[in-house]
Amino acid sequence: MAKRTKKVGIVGKYGTRYGASIRKQIKKMEVSQHSKYFCEFCGKYGVKRKAVGIWGCKDCGKVKAGGAYTMNTASAVTVRSTIRRLREQIEG
């Protein structure tokens, strides 16, 4: 059986190339890109990356635009919280 990676995980495919710090950055991106996310439409963990910035739920079939490597970008979270806060100010 082939030897498995212990520390490097998904970036073991790069071997010793590109340097350790760059491989750590890439590992963070690739782990988030391949993980499953929570679907806000059906309530299940079924959202996976289809292409760059396109995320689709395998359970309900909904497709959502998001970030390249994560489903929600930092700026999108900021905008969503600002809109929520402004709505609450208007209502009450």
Swiss-Prot record:
Give, as residue ranges, the zinc fingers classified C4-type: 39-60
Q: Which Gene3D superfamilies match?
A: 2.20.25.30
GO-annotated molecular function: structural constituent of ribosome; zinc ion binding
Provide the alphabetized UniProt keywords: Metal-binding, Ribonucleoprotein, Ribosomal protein, Zinc, Zinc-finger
Any one GO CC term of this protein is: cytosolic large ribosomal subunit
Q: Which Pfam families match?
A: Ribosomal_L37ae
- Asked if Transcription is a keyword of the record, the answer is no
Q: Which InterPro entries match?
A: Ribosomal_eL37/eL43, Ribosomal_eL43, Ribosomal_protein_eL43, Ribosomal_zn-bd
Q: Name one GO biological process term.
A: translation
- Keyword field contains Zinc: yes
UniProt lists the family membership as follows:
Belongs to the eukaryotic ribosomal protein eL43 family.
Q: What HAMAP family has UniProt attached to this entry?
A: Ribosomal_eL43
Q: What is the protein name for this chain?
A: Large ribosomal subunit protein eL43y
Report the source organism: Arabidopsis thaliana
Instruction: Identify the gene encoding this protein.
Output: RPL37AC
